[in-house]
Amino acid sequence: MAQAPAKCPSYPGSGDGEMGKLRKVALITGITGQDGSYLAEFLLEKGYEVHGIVRRSSSFNTGRIEHLYKNPQAHIEGNMKLHYGDLTDSTCLVKIINEVKPTEIYNLGAQSHVKISFDLAEYTADVDGVGTLRLLDAIKTCGLINSVKFYQASTSELYGKVQEIPQKETTPFYPRSPYGAAKLYAYWIVVNFREAYNLFAVNGILFNHESPRRGANFVTRKISRSVAKIYLGQLECFSLGNLDAKRDWGHAKDYVEAMWLMLQNDEPEDFVIATGEVHSVREFVEKSFMHIGKTIVWEGKNENEVGRCKETGKVHVTVDLKYYRPTEVDFLQGDCSKAQQKLNWKPRVAFDELVREMVQADVELMRTNPNA
C-alpha cells in the first residue's frame, strides 16, 4: 500500500489546547512560485504572519508576490517577510527556522518540471528529495517537533505508470521520472518523521493544478501564452509533445486551500487533492482556441500531426518529438473522496473556466508586454 497510517498520539493545536491559536506564523519554501504566491495570499487573508524562503538571483524573481509587499515599489515588507535561503543548504534552513519559529511550514520549493528532471536528475534529487529531509532535520535541531506542523507538496507523478484508476491514497506508487523518484523519497521521509518523532507532518498528493501564474515552460501555460500571441498576431504556430497525455487539471487557488486544511485537521494524514476529471493536452489546445474564436481540426498522425484552424486554414500547432519524455506518464486521474469527507474540501473552478481564465490573462499580458 502506498500510504502508511498515522499513529501519533497528540499534536500542536489539536483538541482544545491553546497552542497555535496565539501565534499564526507560516514559513513557505517556494513562495515565489505559482502555489507559494497563492498560499501566501490565502494565509495573509487569514491573519498569518508569512515568511518565505527565496533563492538569491541576479534579478528579482518575486514577480508573483510583488503585490503582497507593504510597498511594492520599494519592496518594503509588511506581514510577508522574505529570507534568502536554499533547500540544498541545511545551515541556512536551521538559521531561518530558529529565527522565525513558525507554527506551520509549507514545503513547496522544488525543481518541479518533470521533463527537465531528466536533464537535472542529481539536482532534482538534492532539492526535492534530500531538501525535504534537511527541512525536517532543521525542525528537530531547533527543538520544534512538538510546536510546528509540516506540509509536504507531494505529487501525482508518484503514480507514474498507474496501477489503478482512479488513483487514491492507497494506490501503489510507480514513478516514471527523476522528479517522481525524488518526490517518492520525500513522501516516505515525511511518513518516517511522523511515525518516529510524532511530528505533525502530512503529504498533499496534488494532481496537476494550473493558473495564470503557472510557469511558462509548463504545457498548459505554453498553450495559453501561444494562443494569446496567435490571437494578437504575434505568433502563427507553436509545437507540443504528446497531445494524448491525459491529466486531472484543477486550479492552484483551490488547491492551496486544501494544503491549509490538512494542517488544521486533528490528526496528520496524507490526502489526494484532485478534480476527478480527465482531459487530454489535445482538449486543452482545442478549448484554448475556442476562447479566441478559432476551431482546431487535426490532420496527420504521430509526429506528423498538425492542428489547423478551420476558419483560416492556417496551421497553428505541430508536434515535436523533443518535447516527449524518455518515459511517458499517459494517464492521471485522482480520487479525492477522502479530502471531501475529512476536510470538507472540493474543487470550485471547472476545467472550462480554468482554460478561459488562463487564455484571457495571457491575452492581456501579451497585449501590454509581448516579451513577457
From Swiss-Prot:
Locate the active site. Answer: T155, E157 (nucleophile), Y179 (nucleophile)
A GO BP entry is:
Notch signaling pathway
Q: Which reaction does it catalyse?
A: GDP-alpha-D-mannose = GDP-4-dehydro-alpha-D-rhamnose + H2O
Q: What is its EC number?
A: 4.2.1.47
Q: Per its Swiss-Prot or TrEMBL entry, what cofactor is needed?
A: NADP(+)
Any idea which residues bear Phosphotyrosine here?
Y323
N-acetylalanine PTM positions read: A2
* Positions of NADP(+) binding: 30-35, 55-58, 86-87, 108-112, 123, 183, 209, 214
What cellular component GO annotations does this protein have?
A: cytosol
Q: Which InterPro entries does the UniProt entry name for this protein?
A: GDP_Man_deHydtase (IPR006368), NAD(P)-bd_dom (IPR016040), NAD(P)-bd_dom_sf (IPR036291)
Q: How is its activity regulated?
A: Inhibited by GDP-fucose.
| Keywords annotated in UniProt | Acetylation, Lyase, NADP, Phosphoprotein
Tell me the NCBIfam families matching this sequence.
Answer: gmd
Protein function: Catalyzes the conversion of GDP-D-mannose to GDP-4-dehydro-6-deoxy-D-mannose.
Q: Which family does it belong to?
A: Belongs to the NAD(P)-dependent epimerase/dehydratase family. GDP-mannose 4,6-dehydratase subfamily.
Name under which the protein is recorded: GDP-mannose 4,6 dehydratase
User: Which source organism does the UniProt entry give?
Assistant: Mus musculus
Q: Which gene encodes it?
A: Gmds
